[in-house]
A protein has these predicted regions:
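PRPP-dependent phosphoribosyltransferase catalytic core
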Residues: 139-199
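Short glycine-rich phosphate-binding loop at a beta-alpha junction
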Residues: 53-60
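Active-site-facing substrate-recognition patch
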Residues: 1-52
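Short Gly/Thr/Asp-enriched flexible loops that form oxyanion-binding sites at enzyme active sites
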Residues: 65-74
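Acidic, divalent-metal-coordinating active-site segment for phosphoryl/phosphodiester hydrolysis
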Residues: 129-138
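Structural motif
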Residues: 55, 124-126, 154
Length: 199
């Protein structure tokens, strides 16, 4: 189970990692109930509010509904969604390669629509994804923001999954470690008899 800041508990499925004896808790946000999605957005917005972002930027795919909901809770009129589908008016200069723990061999690119550039240039940006696990997806988002001279004031997600992301974000994110926040954390798990314990 994963405990939210307000004390409520989420029961998440455990996914064994092949050949390791370890496992991770799994969160697939678009398969969660609306109540769970709302609770995670509430918790993340509360964690991001002290950083006073002007705009929330969201990473595709599952980070987009969370970013939108967080932006609404922060009182913003809109958010800045990044995308992986290239429209004909996009600028390749506003893109970076993208892979993730769930699609490591993908050759996608992460794009910012040039029309959204005025929203993020010079702004206090909070960059949001659903889960930060290996740190590859969020690092791509940080790289894209760096191309336009923006260092986010905070990085947020619903679930900080294990600690594997820390080294990659230490390289990619110029902000302080405490500016990386999640609605909850989920440790790496190790087999313990018939169940699992924190590794």
């Amino acid at each position: 189970p994963a405990r939210l800041p307000d004390g409520r508990v989420l029961h998440l499925p455990i996914r064994p990692l092949a050949g390791t004896g370890n496992a991770i808790a799994s969160l697939i946000l678009n398969q969660a109930s609306f109540a769970v999605e709302a609770a995670l957005a509430d918790a993340l917005a509360e964690r991001l509010a002290p950083f006073r972002p002007d705009i929330v930027a969201g990473l595709p795919t599952l980070g987009l509904p969370l970013a939108r909901a967080v932006a609404e809770r922060l009182g913003h009129a809109r958010y800045a969604p990044f995308g992986t589908s290239r429209k004909f008016w996009y600028d390749e200069g506003l893109s970076v390669p993208l892979s993730s723990i769930t699609s490591p061999d993908a050759t996608k690119r992460l794009y910012l629509d040039p029309r959204l550039l005025p929203l993020v240039e010079g702004a206090r940006v909070a960059l949001v994804d659903d889960v930060i696990s290996s740190g590859t997806s969020i690092s791509a988002g940080l790289g894209l923001l760096a191309r336009i001279g923006v260092t986010p004031v905070a990085v947020g997600c619903a679930m900080l999954q294990t600690e594997r992301w820390r080294p990659r974000l230490a390289e990619a994110f110029a902000g302080p470690p405490e500016a990386v926040v999640g609605a909850f954390r989920s440790p790496l798990l190790a087999r313990d008899g018939e169940g699992w314990r924190e590794a």
